[in-house]
């Protein structure tokens, strides 16, 4: 099958390309990128006024499958991904059973191949059962198809176990994704510690719970010379630690999520459980630090931490509500808001959704280089729309952005040369 995309603004940050080019896809690969491409028997897509970029990649997604399919499954989650412009996602291992073994990894890959909406890269567990006690079989999981390991949802609290995990993972060149959190400091907190928490009568989570854990994990990564990717950064202190570590040459990358550069703890006012996540929404100063970190490359990845929940798990009092929000269909327009507000260049914004995540986990996408897999996202940056949570592709509806007026949207998603989403579909 051939697809010829014409008249679009081709933006490939990995190769410094920002030109009005055509893109020819043939035999599931990028066959040609250039001007006035001529070919017969190709499906033509006129991308006038649109951006043509490498397929977006989200390296922090909870697909809830196996075990929690009432919230999301691989089919619905990848459908939501495609609708958001993502051609690939990396799924977290906190499922039931936990993805701490070869068999569960193979199950995920098999089901993802059947769904076909987006590529799925499994992330295995660092420790067996996510219990933080003994290391999982990292080598077996990598051989089965895992691209990284994490105990996401739980920190690896024991420093020696984290050290051994980094050393073991280094032998396979496998990135460790760190959920950096000191549970002894978190206690029974449910939102950011500060004035708003006091005003609402809710127990707070201090910023130092994240920052101290990031500091430990970064130092362990330097000590072991292992690859570390810091997940869902939400605080100024964490940004500063990561910036300094990268300047020293540490093998550290880091991500943040759209809610951390869009919302602050003020969103919790009214006890809105859709504004409850872990780590919690922070202060306006933290938000500015996150934006600065994206602009200077300290944070090279924007990932959603897409965390679907059933309404019964959110429509309860704030203290009892589960943490997390969905984000696959809102990440792109929220990122484009940063561009419109002058906080991030368009090229850097697209890089944080493409080449940045690909580099962090050594994934094959993130570029429109000739010969590479034909994973392409076409974006209309000017389209205006209002988010209706009930109209989303995810099985869950837990978003704090309901009824927000957004600008910019994926209008076509192409995975391995197959169109998996059109806005008109």
Curated annotation (Swiss-Prot):
Zinc among keywords = yes
Q: Name one GO molecular function term.
A: zinc ion binding
Q: Which domain of life is it from?
A: Bacteria
Return the cofactor note field: Binds 2 Zn(2+) ions per subunit.
Is Metal-binding found in the keyword set? yes
Q: Which chemical reaction does it catalyze?
A: (S)-dihydroorotate + H2O = N-carbamoyl-L-aspartate + H(+)
List the protein's name. Dihydroorotase
Record the organism.
Syntrophotalea carbinolica (strain DSM 2380 / NBRC 103641 / GraBd1)
